[in-house]
Amino acid sequence: MGVMLQAFYWDCPKIENREHQWWTYIKSKLPAIEQAGFTALWLPPANKAAGWKSMGYDPYDYYDLGEFDQKGGAPTWFGSKAELLDLIQSAHALGLQVYADLVFNHNSGGDAQELNPIDGQSRWTKFDPKSAKFTRDWKCFHPSQYETWDGATFGDMPDLCHRTPLVYTELINYARWLLEEIGFDGFRYDMVKGYGGWMVRSIQELRALRGSSSFKPYAVGECWDSERTIDDWLDEANAWSDNPVGAFDFPLRWRLRDLCDSYGFSLRDLTDRGVLMWDRSAQAVTFVENHDVVRDSPIINDKVLAYAFILTHEGYPCVFWQDYFNWDLAQPNNQRGIDALIKVHEQNAGGPTQVLYVNDDLYVMQRLGDGDHSGLIFVLNNRGTWNGTWIQTRWDNTRLVPAAWHGRDDSGVPEDKWTNESSWIDLWAPPRGYAVYVPA
């Protein structure tokens, strides 16, 4: 399915001294991103926000992508509309898809207060953006004439009422504009617990036009909750849909944090259900960090173990910008980091998953392969010494070679091994590390 890169982190323009230049900075990284094997970019919200220096999650003018002088200036914190268009076109030229971040639960930065006659409260619900598109007033927000509440609010920001016909149609039109005019290929839906899944389904059923052909947008939703809640949301959002949306696998992320940071974690727990990767792999977007969790609950130790897990297992893996570009986990030109794992994912990680062996300290998994992928063996070791076992694989009389590995203290390199005529082989992984073996 490919590998997604989250192409931002919180306050990245300020931290990297790229204020109003983030789009051009990403563009400068595109050759390296493409060469590494990434297939898609997830960009931060491109709309003009309530503040000039904002990450965009407080949307004011959806249609201002950095061209109207309002809320402090013309460009967004990431740059101008022209620079965004250039970034998208440059990414497409390299075969990369680009996903927009849609914040449809709430708005911010209203131009005037209004009295809502339904509850008698005054709120900042009058929006007259300079784009002159999707102007809003109290009738567009909760409580409205169509419903009083729809699931969740975000702070005290005005909460959009999607059952109001104007809001519903304007958001669909905006999504179509992003696909057809701006060039986005899909969406990440922010805070989907805040509004009905039917709204997402309505957008996903769009057939966007590009040139003389139509296409279905890719999408993933941020349902930050337990697997049961995510399941319920996926069922609602995808009911009768021929273009189902996926969801970020938050339950798996917490499990991977325990793997990396909790002393005594049993590798048996990796096989437990209750994560999308095992239960709904076709709709699972797996990740290790994102712009939210890294600020409050970061993974501190041995994070590459988590990346090895998501880049060898089923699901659509997403790599975090800081992990790749800032924190030295890419490790280009060797087999000990994310780059080698991306290559494994794209060349070998296909077909069903079989757990061949597991105990508290050793986990061995096999991907059976498919038409485009050869399959692999993933060995994860939680001991402080080399660890391995005999397993029966799908290959007989075949040489398996280590394609990616990592261990604490860089203690040695896994060896090439041959399966016997009965497909048995003994495979090992470095201390507190992993090894990925593929058929030669």
Task: Pin down the residues of each PLM region.
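Active-site-proximal helices and loops of the catalytic beta/alpha 8
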Residues: G2, Y25-A32, F38, P45-N47, ...
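A near-ubiquitous, low-amplitude feature marking generic local secondary-structure context
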Residues: E16, Q70, A74, P143, ...
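Glycan-binding loop/region signatures in secreted carbohydrate-active enzymes
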Residues: Q6, G109-E170, A237-Y263, D328-N348
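Solvent-exposed, acidic/flexible segments
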Residues: E19, W77-L84, T164, Y168, ...
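Acidic/aromatic-lined carbohydrate-recognition and catalytic surfaces
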Residues: M1-F154, L160, K193-G221
